[in-house]
Amino acid sequence: MEDETVALVIDNGSGMCKAGFAGDDAPRAVFPSIVGRPRHQGVMVGMGQKDSYVGDEAQSKRGILTLRYPIEHGIVTNWDDMEKIWHHTFYNELRVAPEEHPVLLTEAPINPKSNREKMTQIFFETFNAPAFYVSIQAVLSLYASGRVTGIVLDSGDGVTHVVPIYSGFSLPHAIMRLDMAGRDLTDYLMKILSERGYSFTNSAEREIVRDIKEKLCYVALDFEQELQTASQSSSLEKSYELPDGRVITIGNERFRAPEALFHPSMLGLEAAGIHETTFNSIMKCDVDVRKDLYGNIVMSGGTTMYPGIAERMHKEISALAPTSIKVKITAPLERKYSVWIGGSILASLGTFQQMWISKQEYDEAGPTIVHRKCY
């Protein structure tokens, strides 16, 4: 069924790796970006113990493993572990031979040059890819929404970026990075639930809290008003059944956790909220493009999935923007995977086929070719 040379699209996030085939409308494989190694050598003797586990298998065996995330705040920090994740992607998840398919990889907006070179080198030298390309995550999200100009708020598990894009090119001087994302909100929810008397501490319990966050949290349009409503009635309370059968009740925590996106000071961070960061990024752009950016604010990534976030963002940005400006927030339903979807669209365009870095070009020019061909 697969075309012999169909391109592979891999979106490496801090929390999840999304991988699949160009032209598909969703990734085939979505698994945690983690590598686990046994804490004690020889504990599992005779159980066919491996020296490392990746993704879901590492997650399920986490009791006996030390888990590491090779991508921190969107940037690869551990190349040995990263290589294991890519190996797992090809051989276990997609079941393809990397030397038979062009590979489109995604990268964080302010990825160091040396990192792009290292990625390029690994794909050509370790995996023998026939062709390779690396694309900025936020730009792909914008493509997926059918635009080439706009400003993308991309918030995942490990990092949040605001990236203004004009005619398909990001404007690097105005890109903003906020080291606050899904993982921090999960931690904060653990903290405020413990104040209610529910104790969640270890990594297994953290997964439960992440699930509570994804199922029950939302963004309030008016935080103070919502707090008042929550204190006066039980209308906002929801119950959640824990794996052991106990049922817990969660009230104002439902909207207190995501509120930190707008007020990072709640987490003890000295940073502007996502609304101010977006506004600041727009203000760093040329005055002539601002109107187009205000009218095309696109949300992307799992941490933008909270109900109510687009409405709140609209309210906050409108309060900051000049009165005559029309503010439009787009929050596509598939925004959890819009980076991957944008990659799938790009890699299957006929016009894109001359953009790939070929193995021959790499052999002639070396890893620095990535800066000339991918920008």
Swiss-Prot record:
The entry's keywords: ATP-binding, Cytoplasm, Cytoskeleton, Hydrolase, Nucleotide-binding
Coiled-coil features, chain-numbered ranges: none
Pfam families, sorted: Actin
Keyword Glycosyltransferase: no
One of the record's GO molecular function terms: hydrolase activity
Lineage: superkingdom: Eukaryota
EC numbers: 3.6.4.-
InterPro entries per UniProt: Actin, Actin/actin-like_CS, Actin_CS, ATPase_NBD
Task performed by this protein: Actins are highly conserved proteins that are involved in various types of cell motility and are ubiquitously expressed in all eukaryotic cells.
Family: Belongs to the actin family.
Name of the protein in its database record: Actin
Organism: Yarrowia lipolytica (strain CLIB 122 / E 150) (Yeast)
Gene: ACT1
